[in-house]
Amino acid sequence: MPSRLRKTRKLRGHVSHGHGRIGKHRKHPGGRGNAGGMHHHRINFDKYHPGYFGKVGMRHYHLKRNQSFCPTVNLDKLWTLVSEQTRVNAAKNKTGAAPIIDVVRSGYYKVLGKGKLPKQPVIVKAKFFSRRAEEKIKGVGGACVLVA
């Protein structure tokens, strides 16, 4: 049905808008929003929203969450953490300043030694290095920097 034929369009300009005398079509008879969930709307809340009110169980205040959280990245994925432009620049001038790869900024803590590194020096910053990773990074003329 086109909106020009709808009842609301017909009632524009009429104060009561089809609800009788002022005050007859009352404001918010049941309260606004979720009002009365524990009182006059309780039946509806119990039937359609069980468990909406109340608490369950106990809260562990000083819970130690995953003390051994240590996301890892392998050497073969190391160069994917820097931009394409950095990779191209590093490949072009191997004698210039070595690019710095900060794995902590990418969400990793530890560098593991799987895979091969391209034969160009690189400075890697991480919280932990495996022995193999450290050997391989230093083998291509790079450096391992420990960060807190």
Curated annotation (Swiss-Prot):
Biased composition (Basic residues): 1-30
Function: Component of the large ribosomal subunit. The ribosome is a large ribonucleoprotein complex responsible for the synthesis of proteins in the cell.
Record region (Disordered): 1-37
Assembly with partners or alone: Component of the large ribosomal subunit.
Membrane-crossing segments per the record: none
Phylogenetic lineage: Eukaryota, Metazoa, Chordata, Craniata, Vertebrata
Annotated keywords: Acetylation, Cytoplasm, Hydroxylation, Phosphoprotein, Ribonucleoprotein, Ribosomal protein
Organism: Oryctolagus cuniculus (Rabbit)
GO molecular function list: structural constituent of ribosome
InterPro entries the record matches: Rbsml_uL15_N, Ribosomal_uL15, Ribosomal_uL15/eL18, Ribosomal_uL15/eL18_sf, Ribosomal_uL15_CS
Post-translational modification note: Hydroxylated on His-39 by MINA.
Family per record: Belongs to the universal ribosomal protein uL15 family.
Subcellular location(s) of the protein: Cytoplasm
Protein name: Large ribosomal subunit protein uL15
Residues modified to N6-acetyllysine: 47, 55, 110
Residues recorded as bearing (3S)-3-hydroxyhistidine in the entry: 39
